Amino acid sequence: MAKGILGRKIGMTQVFAENGDLIPVTVIEATPNVVLQKKTVETDGYEAIQVGFEDKRVKLSNKPQQGHVAKANTAPKRFIREFRNVNVEEYEVGQEVKVEIFAEGDVIDVTGVTKGKGFQGVIKRHGQSRGPMAHGSRYHRRPGSMGPVAPNRVFKQKKLPGQMGGNVVTIQNLEIVKVDTDRNLLLVKGNVPGSKKALVTVKTASKAK
């Protein structure tokens, strides 16, 4: 069954494997999450657990939110997410979910919001090639052809300049290099989406080989 936890991306560093290989890793700090609700097929139509991450001040939450977390005997949470395909019987409302649910060598999917880049052209946004920079081409970083003459319009999905970044992206099949239970850290091989201190969702890989 699947497992999941919420955390924050701290940054990147590198560690050495036993054979001397240098492994770039992303450090994710996942302080204990709290199970706020168990959803079942009978009551909600599907099975899932709802977890909360990071306390926030009571004055920043309304009465329904305060009542919801009171059932778990915890403080209001800044982030609340659901994890499906989990064994609901293993969890109880108010239980803490810690990094120790994962082990070294586990394969995971990490979801986050990519860094916002603002308004960008087609070369940076879509990786298109630029035109010649000399010999009077007068065509350097422009989008290029908008399409054939016949339809008298530009087709949808045409790659054009525009807002880049700020998208929800999942990177699949990342390997956990180390689990530090004392400091609530996960060291994940490779990079994960988002800026430093960004919220990330770590869960068991859905397409693990």
From Swiss-Prot:
What does the UniProt keyword field contain? Ribonucleoprotein, Ribosomal protein, RNA-binding, rRNA-binding
UniProt keyword Secreted, yes or no: no
A single Gene Ontology biological process assigned to it is: translation
InterPro entries from the entry?
Answer: Ribosomal_uL3 (IPR000597), Ribosomal_uL3_bac/org-type (IPR019927), Ribosomal_uL3_CS (IPR019926), Transl_B-barrel_sf (IPR009000)
Q: Does the keyword Ribonucleoprotein apply?
A: yes
What is one Pfam family matched by this protein? Ribosomal_L3
Q: Where is this region: Disordered?
A: 125-148
Q: Which PROSITE patterns match?
A: RIBOSOMAL_L3 (PS00474)
Q: Which GO terms describe its molecular function?
A: rRNA binding; structural constituent of ribosome
Q: One GO cellular component from the entry?
A: cytosolic large ribosomal subunit
The signal peptide annotation in the UniProt record is none
Query: PANTHER family per the record?
Result: 50S RIBOSOMAL PROTEIN L3, LARGE RIBOSOMAL SUBUNIT PROTEIN UL3C
Stated role: One of the primary rRNA binding proteins, it binds directly near the 3'-end of the 23S rRNA, where it nucleates assembly of the 50S subunit.
The subunit structure is:
Part of the 50S ribosomal subunit. Forms a cluster with proteins L14 and L19.
**Family (UniProt):** Belongs to the universal ribosomal protein uL3 family.
Q: What is this protein called?
A: Large ribosomal subunit protein uL3
Give the organism, scientific name.
Answer: Lysinibacillus sphaericus (strain C3-41)
- Highest classification ranks of the organism: Bacteria, Bacillati, Bacillota, Bacilli, Bacillales
Q: List the gene name.
A: rplC
